[in-house]
């Protein structure tokens, strides 16, 4: 049995009225639902693709204006924290949109991870629909109030030691750290990376790990522990 969509309830939650309600219905239609009900003309996948770009643009613009002195690297990593699946899941929860998702009975959403993915995709699809129907302005008006305030965003930048080190060297020395990765093997012979971090040509820290990303974090953490008295 196909389900009906309470368009007015969703529009009330979004504070946006669709000129073309079919866009909203498409945004709510999970691919698994269309598989069970072929009469559903289109599923949400294309709108998800568009909505992902809309979300990224709005969040990028918001951070750009909110933090005028922030460099590109920190802007990028902070944006990533605000547009990932977990963040989008939280935004969907805030708007209570999940209950409107049209999803097939056979689709597994028992796991928390499955629910996060489905709800994140739903948010992106709805943003894509809003953008097509009304442009960027209403999409912005939906997204920005969902974002953390400035004081809550700041810690997101500093969770990663690489971000903290970059902020520290820029503030104190007006330079960026550089990383050099070398092949490395652990005691059991597993391949990995030996990463060195340099500031002004001086070696500040080293890290050893199975992945280059983790080795860079460890090197940055060591650099902070020896050069930043606040850490």
From Swiss-Prot:
Subcellular location: Cytoplasm
Entry's family note: Belongs to the ribonuclease III family.
Role description: Digests double-stranded RNA. Involved in the processing of primary rRNA transcript to yield the immediate precursors to the large and small rRNAs (23S and 16S). Processes some mRNAs, and tRNAs when they are encoded in the rRNA operon. Processes pre-crRNA and tracrRNA of type II CRISPR loci if present in the organism.
Subunit comment: Homodimer.
Residue sites binding Mg(2+) per the record: 48, 121, 124
Gene Ontology MF, one: ribonuclease III activity
GO biological process: mRNA processing; regulation of gene expression; RNA processing; rRNA processing; tRNA processing
Record-annotated DRBM domain positions: 160-229
Name the record gives this protein: Ribonuclease 3
PANTHER family xref list: RIBONUCLEASE 3 (PTHR11207:SF0), RIBONUCLEASE III (PTHR11207)
PROSITE patterns xref list: DS_RBD (PS50137), RNASE_3_1 (PS00517), RNASE_3_2 (PS50142)
Domain RNase III: 7-135
InterPro entries: dsRBD_dom, RNase_III, RNase_III_dom, RNase_III_sf
A Gene Ontology term for the protein's cellular component: cytosol
């Amino acid at each position: 049995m196909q389900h009906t969509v309470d368009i007015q309830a969703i529009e009330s939650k979004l504070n946006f009225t669709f000129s073309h309600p079919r866009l909203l219905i498409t945004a709510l239609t999970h691919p698994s639902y269309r598989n069970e009900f072929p009469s559903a003309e289109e599923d949400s996948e294309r709108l998800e693709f568009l909505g992902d770009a809309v979300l990224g643009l709005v969040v990028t613009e918001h951070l750009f204006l909110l933090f005028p002195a922030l460099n590109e690297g920190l802007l990028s990593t902070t944006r990533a924290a605000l547009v990932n699946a977990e963040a989008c899941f939280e935004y969907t929860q805030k708007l209570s949109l999940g209950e409107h998702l049209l999803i097939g009975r056979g689709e597994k959403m028992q796991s928390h991870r499955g629910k996060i993915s489905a709800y994140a995709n739903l948010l992106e699809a709805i943003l894509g629909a809003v953008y097509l129907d009304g442009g960027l302005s209403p999409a912005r008006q939906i997204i920005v109030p969902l974002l953390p305030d400035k004081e809550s965003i700041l810690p997101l930048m500093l969770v990663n030691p690489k971000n903290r080190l970059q902020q520290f060297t820029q503030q104190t020395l007006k330079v960026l750290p550089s990383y050099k990765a070398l092949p490395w093997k652990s005691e059991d012979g597993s391949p990995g990376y030996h990463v060195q971090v340099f500031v002004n040509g001086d070696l500040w820290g080293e890290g050893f790990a199975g992945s280059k990303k983790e080795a860079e974090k460890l090197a940055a953490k060591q650099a902070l522990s020896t050069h930043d008295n606040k850490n």
